[in-house]
């Protein structure tokens, strides 16, 4: 029985106490070297020098209606590519290459000999290259062949290439195993926490070895046979522990030393966080003794304008965007994320459902994971769990999403197999899966749901009451929901402890699943993204609470208020609904919400009615137009915490007041200039850091001009280099790596990458308006 579960056949009580670690593979570890720089990329007979992370698809741009990845992949091409790099043989008895992610079907060759391969594009893998290295003065060559030509193989934008980091690991034959430190806390109170540390020692030599593992004051003796491993464990206590939580993400660290004959042969320092949590149908989700409602978002792996290229700075920014939007939970849909993303969740304070797969044995696309599942699923689950099990942010493992074969009894066997594979490496977290029904036959899932510790509901939470009556011990969370149902989903979780939370689809706009979330106008083509032929003019999904430039949509502010505000201390936000007929008669798709904007600029609509929405939990809202009272509205749960005013539009100033706060929207004048702002004025001169620069079209008073669509030309000089540019218009087919971008709704974004030298980077943007510039320091 897993150590976090006390259960009978029909009951569930999860009591989970764990502490976890940020992986010891931090930059600067003496046993590793970043291998991201100076690769030769070969494709279609052409060779260029590239630095990793690298995604060749994003450099070409969408080929609307024609790209091999289809509407699901955003009309990009996929294909094949080859990466080459030379290097000197490093010191060390054993040398390995760690690939954090290659999409997909990677083959690794060292000096012409095949050293390893890996099929799945989202899990890390390590290749021992020791037997293939030169041991004289000759340079070695690594070749990585990537095959993403079998299309379509993914329901969203995957990217193509070595899109995550590569590391060279050097070690003695006797060493702490990769991901070989595991930290848990079986007992946590406010006064004291019990911390258990397991250390796995690997002996890759031809003789038995006697070793000592030191963790704090503990000295653990062990004998490790040749070509074998041995795990030792110790326990210590932390008095008055500072508990990890989203509000207070406290981290500790401990060091494990491996010694032989008194000499230290390996050392690993691990950051960890202490906290306890439980899931229960009567109490809900309890973290450190307090009930917490889970306000979650599903997030894909792409980084928008960067495609799949997983820079640490972009991953951190993504987590921070979700934190700033009021979320406390992310579901990594539908694949393992990056180490940097999870490190950010640990340090910023964000709970995580770590998801392994989209589908299983029945294909969703002709060349998806179903083609390799039987030979790969245990390896891939182990890779995910071993790498991630020390992260305090992770509260659940997810084994799948909307599997097609749900009516086949064998699906229960598959779920059990996957759960067992996870438990081989970690029993401290519940296993979940996102279930969905495309017909009325929902109850057929009951035997499948029995396998799961927490049951994921995709768009099916309206079944919660009848399911609870049928199975009162079942713990549920809605693993996907429609953005438009924000209030109802909050209410269900707020009122029913057995429903522990909700995850909207999605937190961020993303590439692929082209046109999901769109609104359109009468006379335009109807249908959803999967309509035959797709919507070739689209290459991304606009269902996110935050758009691809990082701007929070009004639905984001509304959701944040629902989950995080109360009457005594409520946020206040005002937005304006696009009038029906302003452009055309508005039509919505399933994931769409009414086009609503932070704008009081509606030229040509003077004297006509327009709806103004104010979001707050304060009991009363007053609205003023040009300092004249328009009206007063009462706000309560009955009004879904919205005050809606119907106002005849006049240019000027619109002001809402509630709870001692006020918010103002002003009519914008003609575009006067470009305003550039950056998320950071100083970035690291390590060749890996990024600055995200927002471009806004403003009038002479600094108001954003929401209808401005102005072509801009970008130049970057100095220490850094241009990476990409983007607007939130997911119908714009300009390649993201082009130095030309057109603002949409008055906004665009530029991404600059650092070099490995100190200095200043100047970013200039030319347009029909005066040229705007901004400088960023590299240190």
Residue ranges and their predicted role:
Residues 27-68, 86, 143-145, 515, ...:
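Accessory carbohydrate-binding/adhesion or oligomerization-edge regions at the termini
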Residues 197-201, 254-257, 592-598, 612-615, ...:
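Beta-strand-rich structural segments
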Residues 37, 42, 78-178, 204-205, ...:
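Accessory beta-strand-rich segments of carbohydrate-active enzymes
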Residues 35-37, 53-73, 120-121, 131-197, ...:
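An acidic-aromatic loop/edge-strand motif
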Residues 27-98, 150, 154-162, 174, ...:
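Extended carbohydrate-recognition surfaces in non-catalytic/accessory domains of CAZymes
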Residues 134-137, 198-280, 648-651, 665-669:
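Extended acidic/polar, glycine-enriched regions
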């Amino acid at each position: 029985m897993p150590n976090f579960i006390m259960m009978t056949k029909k009951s569930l009580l999860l009591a989970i106490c764990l502490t976890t670690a940020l992986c010891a593979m931090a930059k600067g570890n003496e046993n590793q070297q970043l291998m991201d720089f100076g690769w030769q990329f070969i494709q279609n007979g052409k060779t260029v020098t590239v630095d990793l992370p690298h995604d060749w698809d994003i450099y070409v741009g969408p080929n609307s209606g024609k790209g091999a990845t289809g509407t699901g992949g955003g009309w990009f091409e996929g294909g094949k590519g080859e990466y080459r790099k030379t290097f000197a043989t490093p010191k060390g008895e054993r040398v390995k290459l760690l690939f954090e992610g290659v999409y997909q079907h990677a083959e690794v060759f060292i000096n012409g000999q095949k050293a390893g391969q890996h099929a799945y594009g989202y899990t890390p893998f390590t290749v021992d290259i020791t037997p293939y290295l030169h041991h004289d003065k000759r340079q070695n060559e690594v070749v990585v062949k990537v095959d993403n030509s079998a299309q379509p193989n993914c329901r969203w934008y995957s990217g193509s290439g070595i899109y995550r980091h590569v590391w060279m690991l050097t070690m003695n034959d006797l060493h702490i195993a990769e991901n070989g430190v595991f930290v848990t806390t079986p007992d946590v109170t406010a006064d004291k926490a019990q911390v258990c540390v397991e250390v796995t020692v690997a002996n890759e030599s031809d003789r038995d070895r006697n070793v000592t593992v030191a963790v704090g004051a503990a000295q653990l003796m062990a004998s490790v046979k040749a070509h074998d491993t041995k795990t030792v464990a110790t326990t210590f206590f932390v008095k008055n522990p500072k508990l990890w939580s989203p509000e207070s993400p406290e981290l500790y660290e401990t060091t494990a030393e491996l010694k032989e004959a008194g000499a230290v042969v390996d050392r690993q320092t691990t950051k960890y966080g202490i906290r306890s949590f439980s899931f229960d149908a009567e109490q809900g989700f309890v973290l450190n003794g307090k009930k917490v409602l889970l306000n979650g978002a599903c997030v894909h792996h792409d980084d928008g304008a960067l495609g799949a290229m997983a820079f640490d700075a972009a991953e951190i920014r993504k987590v921070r965007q979700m934190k700033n939007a009021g979320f406390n939970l992310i579901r990594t849909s539908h694949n393992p994320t990056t180490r940097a993303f999870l490190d950010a969740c640990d340090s910023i304070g964000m709970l995580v459902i770590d998801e392994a797969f989209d589908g299983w044995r029945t294909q969703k696309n002709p060349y998806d994971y179903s083609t390799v599942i039987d030979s790969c699923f245990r390896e891939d689950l182990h890779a995910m769990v071993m790498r991630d099990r020390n992260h305090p942010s992770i509260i659940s493992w997810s084994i799948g999403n909307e599997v097609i074969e749900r009516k086949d009894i064998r699906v229960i066997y598959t779920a059990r197999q996957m759960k067992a594979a996870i438990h081989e490496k970690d029993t401290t977290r519940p296993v979940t899966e996102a279930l969905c029904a495309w017909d009325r036959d929902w109850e057929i899932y009951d035997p499948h749901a029995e396998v799961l510790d927490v049951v994921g509901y995709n768009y099916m939470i309206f079944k919660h009451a009848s399911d609870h009556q049928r199975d009162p011990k079942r713990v549920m969370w809605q693993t996907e929901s429609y953005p438009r149902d924000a209030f109802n989903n909050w209410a269900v979780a707020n009122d029913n402890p057995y429903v522990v939370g909700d995850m909207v689809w999605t937190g961020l706009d993303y590439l692929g699943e082209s046109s999901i979330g769109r609104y359109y106008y009468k006379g335009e083509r109807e249908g959803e993204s999967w309509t035959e032929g797709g919507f070739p003019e689209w290459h991304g999904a606009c269902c996110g609470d935050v758009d691809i430039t990082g701007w929070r949509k009004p639905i984001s502010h509304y959701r944040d208020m629902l989950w995080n505000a109360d009457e005594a201390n409520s946020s206040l936000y005002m937005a304006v609904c696009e009038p029906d007929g302003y452009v055309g008669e508005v039509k919505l798709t399933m994931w769409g919400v009414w086009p609503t904007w932070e704008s009081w600029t509606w030229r040509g609509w003077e004297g006509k009615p327009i709806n103004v929405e104010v979001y707050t939990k304060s009991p009363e809202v007053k609205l003023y137009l040009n300092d004249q009272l328009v009206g007063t509205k009462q706000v309560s749960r009955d009004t879904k915490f919205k005050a809606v005013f119907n106002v005849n539009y006049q240019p000027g100033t619109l002001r809402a007041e509630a709870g001692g706060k006020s918010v103002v929207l002003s009519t914008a004048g003609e575009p006067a200039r470009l305003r550039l702002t950056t998320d950071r004025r100083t970035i690291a001169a390590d060749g890996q850091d990024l600055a995200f620069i927002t471009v806004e079209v403003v009038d002479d008073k600094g108001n954003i001009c929401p209808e401005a669509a102005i072509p801009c030309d970008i130049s970057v000089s100095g220490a850094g280099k241009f990476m990409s540019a983007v607007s939130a218009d997911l119908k714009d087919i300009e390649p993201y790596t082009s130095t030309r971008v057109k603002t949409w709704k008055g906004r665009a974004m530029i991404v600059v990458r650092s070099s490995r030298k100190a200095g200043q980077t100047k970013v200039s943007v030319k347009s029909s308006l005066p040229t705007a510039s901004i400088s960023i320091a590299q240190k």
